[in-house]
Amino acid sequence: MKTTRLIVGCIAILVLSGLIGTAVSAQAATPITAQTEPGDPLDPRTYEPGSRPFLSLHATGVQRYACQANGTWLFSDPVADLYTQDGTGKPVGSHYLNFTTGRPVWEFQDGSTVEAARRVTVSGGAGNIASLLLQAVVTTAGDDGDRLVKTTWVQRLNPSGGVAPDGACTPGNTIAVPYSTDYVFWASKASSEDE
């Protein structure tokens, strides 16, 4: 009788463990929800039906500008840390400019990167940099993984700050303007089906 109870108890524990494990796996596999709709100029599905978002990161950093000889600010490059949207506060990557190509790069903690070219620009509102849709040009696997390799599109959404100040500047000066935004990484239908 004790043996039967012990076996039943062990089976119950295994079943519950399996259910708990399944619940955790399901939670971890929850898909990223698109913040835009097909037809929206910032939505990749407008140009490539079947695309889906697979990663959403929050960025905080600066947009750097250099003052030109004519006394106006010219955008130089972004420098930002990337964070998951779960509120843990741990950086998982970085965002910067490839000075050779002039294109923005996102690098995940596994070393994988995506470099993209701007396709659509929409005003981010007064005092904010623009919202963007960028198309991947080059992706590379990192030494520790390939999280960003399947990226075909990158959205820059919900921008705050980052705009150069109004008015004249002293030639040769530089300025770093704080900004934050969300970057959403999209994969094509073909790479979505490969998973």
Give names to the regions the model predicted.
Residues 2-28:
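Secretory targeting and sorting signals
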Residues 28-64, 71-195:
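Primary mode marks residue(s) on the alpha4-beta5-alpha5 output face of response regulator receiver
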